[in-house]
Amino acid sequence: MITNVTLTTKEKFLLEDAKTHEENCIKKYSNYEQLACDAQLKAVFRANGQKEQEHLQTINQLLSGQVPSMNQGSQGSQNSQSSQGGQSSKQSGHARVQSQQASIDQQSSGTSAFKASDKELCTDMLMTEKYVSSTYNTAIFEFKDTQVRDVLNHIQKEEQKHGEAIFAYMQSKGMYSPS
C-alpha cells in the first residue's frame, strides 16, 4: 500500500543526496562487476547493484510524495549473498593466482591503463557502503513522518547487508581480517 506524504525542503534535499548516492552505487557496482576477476565477486556486485536499483526507485517514489510499503521480504537474496562468501581455501588460492596473473598480464602488455584488483574493488565498495549507510542513519532522524523513517531504515539495513556480503567475500578470500 502506498501512502502520500508532503516533504519539507530539508527532507527533499536529503532525499536528493540519497538519490545521488544510489545512482553512484549503481554505476560503481555495474563497472566493478565488469572489472572483477572472480565470478563469485561478480555475483556479489551484481546482486548488490540490483538492490541499489530498487533503492533508487524507492527514493524516487519518496521524492514524488509517495511512501511505499516495506513489508516485502528482501532478506532472501541478501542471505544467499552472505553464504557465497564461504568458499574453500583451494578456490581462494586459485582466485589469488588468477588475480596475480591478471596483474602480470596487464603490466606486461605495455599499456598504462590501471587494472584494479578484486581486493581494491571490494575495499572501495566497502568504504562506499559504510558511507552511504551512515548518511541514511543521519537522514532518518531528520524526517518527521514515521513511515518515511521506516522506509529509510529499511534501505539502511540493506546497505549494511551489502557491506556484510562484501566483508564476507573478502574474509573468505583472505583479503580482510577483523582481528
Mark where each language-model region is:
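Membrane-interacting alpha-helical segments
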Residues: 1-12, 61-80, 101-119, 171-179
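Acidic, metal/ion-handling microdomains and their immediate structural contexts
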Residues: 6-7, 17-52, 56-57
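Acidic/histidine-rich alpha-helical segments that form the ligand environment
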Residues: 11-35, 90-154
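A detector of long soluble domains/segments in diverse envelope-associated and cytosolic proteins
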Residues: 15-19, 33-35, 158-179
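DHp/HisKA dimerization-phosphoacceptor four-helix bundle of two-component histidine kinases
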Residues: 20, 47-54, 124-127, 154-161
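Conserved alpha-helical segments that form or flank metal/cofactor-binding pockets of metalloenzymes
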Residues: 39-97, 160-174
